[in-house]
């Protein structure tokens, strides 16, 4: 298996298969016909619905009434791709490292999506001589794909004390980027470390500057 390397870290990208699990509702077509069913999925312009008796129906999205087509544009999250990048330099101070990170979120699915999404980026560092981690930067923003297929979330420039020169020095070890829909459900997530993906619900609760241990519990240094 070939692993894609970015800088000196291995990028691990988890793809989450979205379970819509939208409760049964009344659907209406352009002719006024109605049916009560649960939304299962949308594929290539086809809407798959499941009736209470377990029977699955396949309906063309174009045949649904305008209100139901609008509902689908916000109820079904799009497929997206996350690209992470970082810039760093020492400037004139050899004891400090300055860094700024950003993510570019690209909509890869063709279906229209007008609902709001939320992007959160956390940059994580480690105290080299102490068993603790720190949130070096955290930014989040709501956005839509109404005007563009891409959205850029840029973090703030932050400074780290080089761990080679200070017992409280830090070094960058990774990031985690999380995209959720208007209901807080996960749309996509990306990180360079397995443990961040596994415990993202704990990590996302930390504020910038928060210090935590290997079990992702708040601590002090």
Where do the protein language model's features map onto the residues?
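Noncatalytic linker/hinge segments flanking ATPase motor cores
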Residues: 78-82, 143-146, 217-220
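Acidic, serine/threonine- and proline-rich intrinsically disordered appendage/tail regions
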Residues: 159-221
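A short, structured loop/turn motif at beta-sheet edges
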Residues: 108-115, 144-148, 182-185
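Compositionally biased alpha-helical segments
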Residues: 20-136, 141, 159-174, 200-206
């Amino acid at each position: 298996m070939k692993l894609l390397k970015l800088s000196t870290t291995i990028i691990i990208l988890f793809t989450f298969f979205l379970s819509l699990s939208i409760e049964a509702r009344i659907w209406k077509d352009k002719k006024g016909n109605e049916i009560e069913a649960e939304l299962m999925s949308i594929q290539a312009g086809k809407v798959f619905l499941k009736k209470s008796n377990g029977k699955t129906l396949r309906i063309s999205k174009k045949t649904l009434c305008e209100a139901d087509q609008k509902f689908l544009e916000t109820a079904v999250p799009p497929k997206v791709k996350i690209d992470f990048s970082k810039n760093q330099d020492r400037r004139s101070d050899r004891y400090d490292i300055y860094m700024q990170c950003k993510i570019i979120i690209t909509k890869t699915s063709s279906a229209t999506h007008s609902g709001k999404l939320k992007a959160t980026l956390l940059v994580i560092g480690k105290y080299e001589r102490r068993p603790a981690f720190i949130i070096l930067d955290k930014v989040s923003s709501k956005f839509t794909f109404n005007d563009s297929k891409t959205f850029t979330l840029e973090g703030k420039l932050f400074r780290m004390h080089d761990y080679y020169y200070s017992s409280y020095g830090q070094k960058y070890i990774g990031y985690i980027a999380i995209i959720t829909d208007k209901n807080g459900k996960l749309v996509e997530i990306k990180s360079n470390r397995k443990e961040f993906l596994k415990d993202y619900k704990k990590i996302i609760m930390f504020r910038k500057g928060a210090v935590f241990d290997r079990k992702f519990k708040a601590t002090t240094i």
